[in-house]
Amino acid sequence: MDSKSFLLLLLLFCFLFLHDASDLTQAHAHVQGLSNRKMMMMKMESEWVGANGEAEKAKTKGLGLHEELRTVPSGPDPLHHHVNPPRQPRNNFQLP
């Protein structure tokens, strides 16, 4: 077998696998959105416990039974407000 016919058979063989793997043969006019939400399983019988380990009671106003606020750190943002400015490298080279 010469190289041209071998290459042609190889391409035909690969095309058969790619044709079956692709979804082009069953393409639709509309696009369906895929849900990418991950849900966490939880026992329904268990008592709801807050972040402090205390059991919560039903509240009449404000947040609901299964809601709580998370604490926010006070102070400047450490990524944007540095305590010291960045240092520049020392250059001991003296021009003549």
Swiss-Prot record:
Disordered: annotated segments: 68-96
Residue positions the entry lists as glycosylated: 76
Signal peptide: 1-21
Keyword Secreted: yes
One Gene Ontology cellular component annotation held by this UniProt entry: apoplast
GO molecular function, one term: receptor serine/threonine kinase binding
Source species, domain of life: Eukaryota
GO biological process: cell surface receptor signaling pathway; cell-cell signaling involved in cell fate commitment; innate immune response; maintenance of meristem identity; meristem development; regulation of meristem structural organization
Alphabetized InterPro entries for the sequence: CLV3/ESR
Location of the protein in the cell: Secreted, Extracellular space
Keywords: Developmental protein, Differentiation, Glycoprotein, Hydroxylation, Secreted, Signal
Tissues in which the UniProt entry reports expression: First detected in heart stage embryos in a patch of cells between the developing cotyledons. In vegetative and inflorescence meristems, expressed in a small cone of cells at the meristem apex.
Hydroxyproline: modified positions: 73, 76
Assembly and oligomerization: Interacts with the extracellular leucine-rich repeat region of CLV1. Interacts with CLV2. CLV3-derived CLE peptides interacts with a tetrameric complex made of two CLV2/CRN heterodimers.
Chain's role: Extracellular signal that regulates meristem maintenance. Acts with CLV1 as a ligand-receptor pair in a signal transduction pathway coordinating growth between adjacent meristematic regions and controlling the balance between meristem cell proliferation and differentiation.
Similarity comment text for this entry: Belongs to the CLV3/ESR signal peptide family.
Additional free-text comment from the UniProt record: His-81 seems to be essential for the activity of MCLV3.
Name of this chain's protein: Protein CLAVATA 3
Organism from which the protein derives: Arabidopsis thaliana
